[in-house]
């Protein structure tokens, strides 16, 4: 049942809070690659050794081993194009944080090309997306909810335009039709955050 999710990190505040250095994106992606390499070794071998640019382990042990073989599914999440090579190398699922169907389709095509370069079957990797969902009973209800979320001097139309890459917005039927666009480009899982829900039991 375990699915192992990991990314390169993006929020500098979290790094500073826990005493980690916040390196540039390329370095963090290199660290991610080495981290997953070590983790996979430790899941499959009695003792693991690795020496990379960033990390080093000698006779490292993971016990007990995972039940899933050869190892638990690995979900790699992130938005940067530099991450795609790590996804192709290690991931069983690629989680896209936000993005319109058009943006994600371009990234999926890059992933296909990256898989081809290393002779990995692209079909082994599932694609998922993290989205915020704003749903109202009808169009008037949607406008009412947006009015409470938009910036002070921003129109409803401006809010919708600004948020289109991260929010599935509208009536239930609108949202369903929008999500179908993701399904059409190969998205198979949705991780959703509901925002702006009314307090009515019906909408919950």
Which residues fall in each region the model found?
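Active-site-adjacent structural elements that line small-molecule/cofactor binding pockets in enzymes
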Residues: 1-204
């Amino acid at each position: 049942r375990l699915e192992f999710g990991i990314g390169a990190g993006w929020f500098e505040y979290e790094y500073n809070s826990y005493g980690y250095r916040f390196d540039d994106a390329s370095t963090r992606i290199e660290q991610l690659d080495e981290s997953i390499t070590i983790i996979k070794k430790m899941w499959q071998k009695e003792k693991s050794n690795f020496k990379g640019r960033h990390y080093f382990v000698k006779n490292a042990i993971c016990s007990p081993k995972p039940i899933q073989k050869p190892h638990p599914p690995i979900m790699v999440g992130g938005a940067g194009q530099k991450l795609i090579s790590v996804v192709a190398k290690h991931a069983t699922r690629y989680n896209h944080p936000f993005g319109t169907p058009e943006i994600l389709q371009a990234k999926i095509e890059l992933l296909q090309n990256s898989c081809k370069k290393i002779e990995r079957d692209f079909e082994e990797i599932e694609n998922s997306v993290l989205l915020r969902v704003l749903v109202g009973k009808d169009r008037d209800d949607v406008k009412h909810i947006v009015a409470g979320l938009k910036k002070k001097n921003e129109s409803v139309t401006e809010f919708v335009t600004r948020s289109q890459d991260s929010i599935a917005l509208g009536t239930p039927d609108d949202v369903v039709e929008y999500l179908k666009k993701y399904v059409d480009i190969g998205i198979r899982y949705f991780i959703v955050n509901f925002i702006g829900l009314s307090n009515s039991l019906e909408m919950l």
